[in-house]
């Protein structure tokens, strides 16, 4: 399959951001078309996001394994390998199964600094039905990089990914 990713998405205004997330969701559908393998889909999703969304220094998955998260496909610097559900922004997302939007990670109790350049973070749960299979973690060197529109846009993209993927039992 040949696929070209759009240039960096425009996040400069609320309207541009909404249009950019609609494009991202369409690109996710195109990239995943005909492929249901979970490793391939997580890898492609991470690459697509990292390549097209501005001001990120890490984008990827942590896989749910018991009461901890284990690093999965990602783009960015070498990452923390294991994160207990009891620690950090990713752990809070895994525990609550709710989106975690953190404007300043240094003010977050129990934050795990895998990359000291990260200043804000957005983490979304990835569910297969009711089962937590992973979290999708986005880090930025900018403080307050993410907002509610980012959370909404990524939640829609994650829903497309989750529904188009065959997850291991």
Predicted stretch roles:
Residues 58, 123, 135:
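Short hydrophobic/aromatic beta-strand element in the GNAT-like acyltransferase core
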Residues 142-144:
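A generic structural motif
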Residues 127-140:
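Sensory-domain boundary capping and coupling elements
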Residues 120-127:
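A short, aliphatic-rich beta-strand micro-motif
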Residues 56, 64-114:
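Regulatory sensory and allosteric helical modules in signal-transduction proteins
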Residues 146-153, 167:
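Well-ordered alpha/beta subsegment
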Residues 1-73, 77, 156-169:
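Intrinsically disordered, low-complexity terminal regulatory regions
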């Amino acid at each position: 399959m040949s696929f070209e990713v759009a240039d960096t998405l425009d996040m400069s205004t609320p309207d541009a951001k909404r249009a950019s997330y609609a494009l991202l969701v369409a690109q996710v559908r195109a990239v995943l078309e005909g492929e249901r393998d979970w490793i391939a889909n997580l890898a492609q999703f991470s690459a697509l996001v990292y390549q097209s969304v501005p001001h990120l220094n890490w984008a990827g998955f942590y896989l749910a394994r018991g009461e901890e998260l284990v690093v999965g496909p990602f783009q960015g610097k070498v990452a923390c390998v294991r994160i207990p559900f009891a620690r950090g922004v990713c752990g809070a997302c895994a525990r609550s199964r709710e989106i975690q939007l953190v404007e300043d990670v240094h003010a977050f109790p129990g934050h795990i600094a895998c990359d000291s350049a990260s200043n804000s973070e957005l983490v979304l749960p990835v569910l297969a039905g009711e089962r937590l299979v992973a979290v999708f973690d986005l880090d930025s060197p900018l403080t307050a990089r993410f907002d509610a529109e980012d959370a909404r846009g990524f939640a829609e993209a994650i829903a497309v990914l989750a529904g188009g993927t065959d997850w291991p039992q």
